[in-house]
């Protein structure tokens, strides 16, 4: 009797601690409660919804009977029609590059976006979580949260925790499955061999060796630490979420109206950053992509998705043109030719309407032709479908999937997902080809004159940079969502075992850039700081016009110059729009539950959480003996955009401005200025700019895995060669290098 009483009391206490969500609580929800709801909806998305209150909301919500709860009834009608035909089933892999799936997920987004209030939004999301494809649900909810007014301030879990299959190798996830099946009971020697360690709190750490020779196909794999970086891929994914290629301008606020120029500069900067990393590893520039030549370097993702489908490998010397994709290749050539001809002519005609491509602002039109499509409102026509999504068509030609317009089921390639596209070296070859179209447009614009570059009365007197040192460290990523829960764990809404993957990543020591600027007046200005290579991989100096597009924008900020000498100190961690390590979702949820005011947490710990570029990757790796590079600083007058008051605008308010370079967008000068146009060397150099040579040193650790347990080279296995792998590796299991003759003759056996 006593035990029963204790059970009843504890059950009542549990209910008091976690109040159920109903219609009444939905109406009165504050930002903290809304945050918790979104976190729960995105937890273990490949499994049934384990939070009973949210499950009941979804089951009891009848979409067809609540047309008055959506601001656009035609959206609801389209959704109901599609549902009758059938959506992508649960368990199948979702990709935006299949026309039918794209239409379905955009309709889902519209349902969430046009919900009249947050109550309807949550109910619709709960219903979708129960009945629609999990990949589509995550995508539609993520985009809706980033664009709805009543969701501002809500933090999304990192995509690598929501769906770890896109960020963790299949062999690592397989080891987690093994641990789950064995309930953590593994032989100690096997744990050593697999690189598994258990902590005192049932947390299992599994090592993912980025230099495992079994995943190497060619020298391009030396860059896996960069291309597979989870924060870099998260940055690219979140950019797409904020600026989807399919989204019309009417969904964007006026601060985002340079969206396609911003899209171009994002791709160009990622490409430039990739080139710096190539030079840091003694590799040359990116090769040109040709449809009619083989891709010499392959890529092996080593990734398996939750339904068992493997992302296909592309081996070396891959032939692009094949029987099944000849039409797609022809489509790519035709689209590209039309756009190139339009740039050369200076205009394009669509449905009888002429669009100019001659002025600086026309880059938005060009961006729509390349990265998106022309809206109907641009032409006042009923059908505008020409030159759409050139980038998607090219990805379809390069990927190992099939370009479908009417089928559900595809095996997606690594290029088909925004969470994984940066991993493949061919992605950068493709982007180079795409960006060359924009460069052609820029070449037709005049070079900047001395008046464009000069800032009268302002001079950069001195630039001092601290010693620049990079190194590799470790990061523990939570991949528990990749492992299925037991029935008891679902009831408890919590996994008994926590699985972490240990990743090796590039980092740098903190540094400062100190600027001494002389001014004869008090004036608002924009300071831009760039970093670029000095020499190529053959140690040859690079011409500035060949090199200008390889400069990465380190920092850009507004500043109020005072009369006289101005000393500006910029810390590497405080440079514009950078993000530090993201908080693990389980820790974030505990923190949200324990605090009373979310605003303080957002300002201190969550700044640039979605839009920030990883601060760790600010610098390329460099060389052990030092890699010489050029730092470029330019100070220009602020040419403020219209309808903005600089005196009342706080550019750090990320709830108001969610773009990736908000400081630059306040200035009328083109993004990438002054390196975006061909440089007239005779008129380029002015007192308000300065080139400074800097050196980046790479610190090679004795064992780069700082938090590694006692031994990794397996001393108990005689078959292992215990020699150290040279170059950039660390002590690892060298199973494939062991001194065993593998050329066994089967007849002898």
Curated annotation (Swiss-Prot):
Tissue: Fat body, and hemolymph of larvae.
Cross-referenced Gene3D superfamilies: Di-copper center containing domain from catechol oxidase (1.10.1280.10), Hemocyanin, C-terminal domain (2.60.40.1520), Hemocyanin, N-terminal domain (1.20.1370.10)
Induction profile: Suppressed by juvenile hormone.
Pfam families linked to this entry: Hemocyanin_C, Hemocyanin_M, Hemocyanin_N
Signal sequence residues: 1-14
GO molecular-function terms, A-Z: nutrient reservoir activity
Keywords: Signal, Storage protein
KW Transmembrane (keyword) present: no
Similarity section: Belongs to the hemocyanin family.
Protein name: Basic juvenile hormone-suppressible protein 2
Gene giving rise to this polypeptide: BJSP-2
């Amino acid at each position: 009797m006593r035990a029963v009483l204790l059970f009843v009391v504890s059950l009542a206490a549990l209910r008091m601690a976690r109040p159920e969500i109903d219609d009444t609580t939905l109406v009165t929800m504050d930002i903290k409660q809304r945050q918790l709801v979104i976190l729960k909806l995105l937890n273990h998305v490949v499994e049934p919804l384990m939070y009973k209150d949210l499950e009941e909301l979804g089951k009891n919500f009848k979409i067809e009977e609540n047309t008055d709860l959506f601001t656009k009834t035609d959206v609801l009608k389209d959704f109901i029609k599609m549902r009758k035909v059938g959506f992508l089933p649960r368990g199948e892999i979702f990709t935006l590059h299949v026309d039918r799936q794209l239409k379905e997920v955009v309709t889902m987004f519209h349902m969430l976006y046009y919900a009249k209030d947050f109550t309807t939004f949550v109910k619709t999301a709960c219903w979708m979580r129960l009945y629609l494809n999990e990949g589509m649900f995550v995508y539609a909810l993520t985009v809706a949260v980033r664009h709805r007014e009543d969701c501002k301030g809500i933090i999304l879990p990192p995509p690598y925790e929501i769906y770890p299959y896109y960020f963790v190798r299949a062999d690592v996830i397989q080891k987690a499955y093994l641990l789950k099946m064995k309930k953590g009971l593994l032989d100690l020697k096997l744990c050593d061999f697999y690189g598994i360690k258990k902590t005192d709190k049932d947390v299992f750490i599994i090592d993912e060796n980025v230099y495992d020779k079994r995943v190497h196909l060619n020298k391009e794999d030396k860059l896996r630490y960069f291309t597979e970086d989870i924060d870099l891929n998260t940055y690219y994914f979140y950019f797409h979420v904020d600026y989807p290629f399919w989204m019309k301008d009417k969904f964007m606020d006026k601060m985002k109206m340079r969206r396609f120029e911003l899209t171009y500069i994002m791709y160009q900067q990622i490409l430039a950053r990739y080139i710096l990393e190539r030079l840091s590893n003694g590799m040359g520039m990116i090769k040109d992509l040709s449809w009619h030549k083989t891709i010499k370097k392959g890529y092996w993702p080593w990734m398996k998705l939750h339904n068992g489908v493997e992302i296909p490998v592309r081996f070396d010397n891959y032939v692009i043109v094949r029987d099944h994709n000849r039409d797609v290749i022809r489509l790519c050539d035709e689209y590209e030719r039309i756009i190139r001809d339009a740039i050369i002519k200076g205009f394009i005609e669509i449905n009888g309407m002429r669009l100019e491509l001659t002025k600086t602002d026309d880059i938005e039109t060009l961006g729509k032709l390349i990265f998106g499509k022309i809206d109907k409102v641009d032409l006042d026509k009923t059908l505008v479908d020409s030159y759409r999504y050139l980038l998607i068509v090219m990805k379809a030609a390069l990927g190992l999937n099939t370009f479908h317009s009417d089928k559900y089921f595809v095996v997606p390639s690594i290029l088909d997902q925004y969470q994984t596209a940066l991993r493949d070296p061919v992605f950068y070859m493709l982007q180079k080809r795409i960006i060359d179209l924009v460069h052609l447009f820029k070449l037709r614009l005049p070079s900047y004159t001395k008046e464009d570059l000069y800032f009268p009365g302002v001079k950069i007197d001195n630039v001092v940079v601290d010693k620049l040192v990079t190194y590799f460290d470790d990061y523990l990523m939570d991949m528990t969502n990749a492992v299925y829960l037991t029935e008891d764990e679902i009831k408890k809404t919590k996994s008994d075992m926590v699985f972490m993957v240990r990743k090796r990543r590039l980092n740098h020591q903190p540094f400062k850039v100190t600027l001494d600027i002389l001014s004869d007046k008090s004036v608002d200005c924009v300071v831009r700081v760039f970093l670029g290579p000095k020499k190529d991989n053959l140690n040859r100096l690079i011409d500035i016009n060949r090199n200008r597009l390889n400069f990465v924008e380190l920092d850009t900020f507004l500043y109020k110059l005072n009369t006289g000498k101005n000393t500006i100190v910029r810390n590497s961690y405080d440079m514009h729009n950078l993000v530090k390590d993201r908080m693990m979702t389980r820790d974030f949820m505990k923190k949200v539950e324990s605090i009373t005011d979310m605003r303080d947490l957002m300002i201190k710990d969550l700044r640039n959480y979605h839009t920030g570029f990883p601060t760790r990757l600010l610098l390329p790796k460099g060389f052990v003996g030092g890699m010489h590079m050029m730092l470029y600083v330019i100070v220009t007058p602020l040419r403020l955009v219209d309808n903005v008051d600089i005196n009342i605008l706080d550019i750090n308010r990320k709830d108001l401005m969610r773009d990736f370079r908000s400081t630059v967008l306040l200035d009328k000068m083109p993004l990438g200025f002054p390196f975006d146009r061909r440089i007239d060397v005779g008129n380029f150099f002015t007192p308000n700019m300065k080139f400074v040579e800097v050196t980046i040193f790479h610190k090679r650790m004795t064992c780069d895995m700082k938090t590694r347990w006692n031994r990794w080279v397996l001393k108990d296995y005689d078959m292992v060669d215990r020699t150290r792998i040279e170059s950039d590796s660390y002590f690892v299991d060298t199973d494939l290098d062991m001194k065993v003759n593998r050329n066994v003759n089967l007849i002898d056996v």
